[in-house]
């Protein structure tokens, strides 16, 4: 094996491959046709193997990327599958196969990625591709940009699948206020700045408390100390993106607001059912519908993209040095306090979500966390930075990530893609929720610890039912 130029590893990449943290990103892609492995190999040789991160290995101390030659055949695995033995249990076979992979680390003697081709029919696809890469290679935005560079529009095979809008962050001052006099603008600026400083101060104090002692309530979704060493399983559900957009427009909010409202509602109903089951087992089930204990502290770690250009860019633009949409792990976390409780009006969850997200957007919490991790890494080393990153994650309950995907169907070398379900493993949570839009679909993708959560389908059932209840409530009020 030959080696070439060396390049420093980014701060978050150092954290992700530190001792005790081995975070891997996965992308599960369902295809409408059987996958031809030769076509995949040819495409990888032309695209992925030439990418700096996918053709580099880590130095012994994990501080530098070292360019190396890539034998693509070593990274594409096509297991032997006895179709007769599997029968109608294609999805179970795929689930078990992917779960076993979460216990097999990537080979650090070569670039940290592999692709598994499973030509097994399920209810949603004719074949499934399982793409695994170490999170130090790049975050979700980076990996999806790479995926788009390798795919084309199904409707026009000659066009690359660049059907994702580029977006800028919203201005803090409305257009109508900008047209007012200087005095009103000054008052708004002073008030907004004071609120920003106050919110940031409170958020950082809560972060410090979470690092030191503040833990979430132990619930049926809260992980134990050994969660990272347990195998993980994956489950996904496809719901209507159009329904989410209808609610978004009717409630004058963002897609994110709707998704977090749905998530908050569904987890409340799921936990209520779990506590009800426990009371029944203990012989103390009451006739009350609400089985939730009072005062549940339930926080969600939410990933935040730190790039100034928050939409997707062509891969070539992301690889340019000092680009505003650069490749890498340029994201941080904020912690969202979910109100776990039953509401008679499903729209209350949406209103709470909108208020919560508006408050969190007006804070420098995410940027400061990233900055502090960089300083700790530089002064105290990767181990201390990894502990600073992982401690608040361990003390919260779950993590939610939302990624915008292609607005129309894409194909990989003549293989139309049915769905895309991103996820990850190696984290300190028993439940990870990824949400990704694709064409007219929204894919709910769960990574979970089966020793803690035995019924992930019920979480997705609750999300689906919550969406229907919100839409029905808006229809009853004549808002749709």
UniProtKB/Swiss-Prot annotation:
Catalytic reaction(s) noted: an acyl-CoA + a 1,2-diacyl-sn-glycerol = a triacyl-sn-glycerol + CoA; a long chain fatty alcohol + a fatty acyl-CoA = a wax ester + CoA
EC identifiers of the protein: 2.3.1.20, 2.3.1.75
GO biological process, one term: wax biosynthetic process
GO molecular function: diacylglycerol O-acyltransferase activity; long-chain-alcohol O-fatty-acyltransferase activity
Pathway: Glycerolipid metabolism; triacylglycerol biosynthesis; Lipid metabolism
One protein family per Pfam: WS_DGAT_cat
Keyword Cell division: no
UniProt keyword annotations, A-Z: Acyltransferase, Cell membrane, Endoplasmic reticulum, Glycoprotein, Golgi apparatus, Membrane, Stress response, Transferase, Transmembrane, Transmembrane helix
Stated induction or repression of this protein's expression: Induced in roots and leaves during drought and salt stresses, and upon abscisic acid (ABA) treatment. Up-regulated in the stem epidermis during active wax synthesis.
Glycosites: 252, 395
Membrane-spanning segments: 194-214, 330-350, 366-386
Coiled-coil region(s): none
Residues forming the catalytic site: 135
CC per GO annotation: endoplasmic reticulum; endoplasmic reticulum membrane; Golgi apparatus; Golgi membrane; plasma membrane
Tissue expression per record: Expressed in roots, stems, leaves, flowers and siliques.
Ranges in the topological domain labelled Lumenal: 215-329, 387-480
Compartments (UniProt record): Cell membrane; Endoplasmic reticulum membrane; Golgi apparatus membrane
InterPro entries (UniProt xref): CAT-like_dom_sf, O-acyltransferase_WSD1-like, O-acyltransferase_WSD1_C, O-acyltransferase_WSD1_N
Taxonomic superkingdom: Eukaryota
Keyword Nucleotide-binding attached: no
Topological domain spans for side Cytoplasmic: 1-193, 351-365
SUPFAM superfamilies: CoA-dependent acyltransferases (SSF52777)
Free-text disruption phenotype from the record: Normal wax ester loads on leaves.
Function as written in the Swiss-Prot or TrEMBL entry: Bifunctional wax ester synthase/diacylglycerol acyltransferase that uses acyl-CoAs with 14, 16 and 18 carbons as substrates, preferably in combination with 16:0ol alcohol. Involved in cuticular wax biosynthesis.
Family membership noted in the UniProt record: In the N-terminal section; belongs to the long-chain O-acyltransferase family.
UniProt protein name: Wax ester synthase/diacylglycerol acyltransferase 7
Source organism: Arabidopsis thaliana
The encoding gene: WSD7
